[in-house]
Amino acid sequence: MKTWDAVIVGAGVIGLSLGWRLRREGLRVLIIDKGEPGRESSYAAGGMIAHCDPHLPAALKPLTFASAAMYPEFVHELQDESRESPDLRDQGTLAFCHDGELLDCEGTRVAAKDEIVRVEPALTQPPLGVSAYWLPERSVDPRALCNALFKAAKHRGVDVVTGSAVTDVEVASGRVAGVKTASSNYPAATVVNCAGAWASQIEPLGLPTRPAKGQMVCVVPAPGDMAEAPVVEHVVRTPEVYIIPRSDRRILLGATVEDAGFDKRTDAETVEKLYRAAVKVVPKIGEMRIHDAWAGLRPASPDKLPILGETSLRGYFAATGHYRDGIMLAPLTAELMTQLITGARLEFDLEPFSPLRFS
């Protein structure tokens, strides 16, 4: 029977990044997913690498800054191996914040009204009590990113099993021995639960994640407007909506945060609300047409911090619970979990994110 050094449960951006990274260290890696790679939370994400967000938990900020800084090299290596572009954009973010919100991110500066008019002429001016800032942030297309990660992992020799849900983590002599699906057993000395919102469903030691639903909308230019200049060049973030331009002229509008269990349906009222909020900021979006709407299930932990590290079962690790920051944290998560699994020196103290904090 074939064996692996590590089995990763979940082929989202976290599982794919970790599998690719572990394989580069020489480990024999298997990734198992209940569906298709990158088709759950990662597929639904907006892709903002928003390390300057003032609402990030303080404990998470050092990790977000480090992971955001890793992105250019991460994508460069990924493109070399996959021959696919994840559409990494570095135009930056224009953020409208309520006065008094602290924006202490290096490189942030106030956006003057005349500058906004010159750089983003389609935008309305911020209302009274709201300030505008330029943030040194990037964005990426998560669907293209996961496609590139899947191809790079396969290129490296990572095994991937799709359409097969892991039901149990197998245990022998007090440590992990592999995983079990309805039809097969997969032996490994290391197992990593990267199953996102579904991480709690894998026994034993189900991790305390729950789904946090987020609805998003995609608008595209009318057929006759495709040759015109893009409506916006920068990511635009307000307290009510964020607007994310893609290089192919699509614009994403998001997003809700809902406690709706595993329900991934969209509703017309929410789609219309997001659309109207975007039109209020960028009136020309009203001339575009709604192309698609979808919902994803973010993996939320009880304290909204990621769950990273070894569980109480030797050899059984967790890398989940990234909530709204999985895309941003993927490069660093893969690096830190690889360091932990291979016994290398850790760049960051992972104790605040340990699965054992919920014991």
Annotated model-derived regions:
Residues 2-14, 30:
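Beta1/beta-strand and adjacent pyrophosphate-binding region of the FAD-binding site
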Residues 20-24, 47-49, 84-89, 185-186, ...:
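Active-site substrate-recognition segment that forms the wall
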Residues 23-44:
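Glycine-rich FAD pyrophosphate-binding loop
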Residues 47-122, 128-129, 277-279:
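Dinucleotide-binding Rossmann-like beta1-alpha1 core, especially the glycine-rich loop
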Residues 132-190, 194:
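Helical element adjacent to the flavin cofactor pocket in flavoenzyme catalytic cores
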